Amino acid sequence: MKKYQIAVAGTGYVGLSIATLLAQHNPVKAVDIIPEKGEMINQRISPIQDEYIEKYFAEKELDLVATLDAEAAYKDADFVVVAAPTNYDSRKNFFDTSAVEKVIALVMQYNPDAIIVIKSTIPVGYTESIRQKTGNPNILFSPEYQRESKALYDTLYPSRIIVGRPEGDERLEEAAHTFAQLLVQGAIGKSQGNTPEANSELRTHNSELNKGIPLLFMG
């Protein structure tokens, strides 16, 4: 599989686990606004508590560079993975998606042709609404199912990989399949923790098996 230039916005549990997974086979630039986190990542010291990230930092040859320079990270990226925080306000029943939107705006400024993949937790219907709001169709959504301190493990052994994309656009259909294959390429295999109910649910979708991992592409 060819190598792709990848940028990851955010180095929390989701962002750093995805960056680590993808950096096994592709050049990855991880963007954060906190200098100390970037310095730690470049020294292969995990800024978060995660046994598998620490293990991969110590043992794997990762093509991973952390940077504060969003332009340098985004301008040549084929894919930009957005893992910015979206804090939930239970009183207002509201996800703060402003950090996600700032990343999207920067990507559109520096590299309007890049495929943007949102990994942040977002409200239902948000991806389509942000496509319409920005006029940018190149926005996909790929939800994460991760536990804190087990984020990379859950990324290496996913129960499923889901990529949402607009229907009827062959280029974005291809981009969604390519991104899913990048995740499969870095993964080890399917989680064994699925319930029979979950497996039954997965069979109702048009799934493909890769390393035993179901891939679901949704409009």
Where are these regions (language model features)?
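Structural/interface elements that position substrates and couple domains in central-metabolism enzymes
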Residues: 1-219
